[in-house]
């Protein structure tokens, strides 16, 4: 139960930080335009109607399609969140759900996701992203690492035979 509370806090915190960071970035951009923060990082304004890296953004009804896809993914993640028995996995899913909700809120309010962080080195420019994207990416990576570690730990030899593995129940 405690992990669920921490997971819900993660959802709310990530969602709130994402929305605040976007509001701040929108305000900053409207007053100052694109701004270099570091040699490799700039504050920009990109309205992303597609998915990752702006893919499929030119589709006529992309916002509607991706809104429904986002809702489906969030609902699926929430079911997994509720069913999860692993504290760390619950927190990872909370971070992912919070980020996904942040981007969904943009789609519902603006018809596109607001991206404002641009990383670049010389002529190389990574597609713009936002705090929610970072949280979704980090949450998924942490969740996958936990799953790999859990499954590696769950396989144990019970017979002395190196080819005989069984699943250890925790």
UniProtKB/Swiss-Prot annotation:
The chain crosses the membrane at residues 5-25, 62-82, 89-111, 126-146. Its main location: membrane. Pathway: Protein modification; lipoprotein biosynthesis (signal peptide cleavage). It comes from the Bacteria. It catalyses: Release of signal peptides from bacterial membrane prolipoproteins. Hydrolyzes -Xaa-Yaa-Zaa-|-(S,diacylglyceryl)Cys-, in which Xaa is hydrophobic (preferably Leu), and Yaa (Ala or Ser) and Zaa (Gly or Ala) have small, neutral side chains. One of its GO terms (biological process) is proteolysis. Keywords: Aspartyl protease, Cell inner membrane, Cell membrane, Hydrolase, Membrane, Protease, Transmembrane, Transmembrane helix. It is an enzyme of class 3 (hydrolase). The keyword RNA-binding does not apply. This protein specifically catalyzes the removal of signal peptides from prolipoproteins. Belongs to the peptidase A8 family. PANTHER family: LIPOPROTEIN SIGNAL PEPTIDASE. This is Lipoprotein signal peptidase. It comes from Anaplasma marginale (strain Florida).
């Amino acid at each position: 139960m405690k992990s669920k509370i921490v997971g819900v806090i993660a959802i709310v915190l990530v969602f709130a930080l994402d929305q605040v960071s976007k509001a701040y970035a929108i305000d900053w951009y409207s007053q100052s335009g694109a701004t270099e923060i570091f040699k490799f990082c700039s504050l920009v304004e990109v309205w992303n109607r597609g998915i990752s890296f702006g893919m499929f953004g030119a589709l006529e009804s992309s916002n509607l399609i991706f809104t429904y896809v986002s809702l489906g993914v969030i609902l699926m993640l929430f079911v997994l969140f509720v069913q999860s028995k692993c504290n760390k996995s619950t927190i990872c899913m909370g971070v992912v759900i919070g980020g996904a909700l942040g981007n969904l809120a943009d789609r519902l309010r603006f018809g596109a996701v607001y991206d404002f962080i641009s990383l670049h080195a010389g002529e190389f420019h990574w597609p713009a992203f936002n705090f929610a994207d970072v949280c979704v990416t980090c949450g998924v990576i942490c969740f996958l690492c936990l799953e790999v570690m859990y499954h590696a730990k769950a396989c144990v030899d019970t017979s002395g035979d190196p080819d005989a593995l069984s699943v250890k129940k925790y």
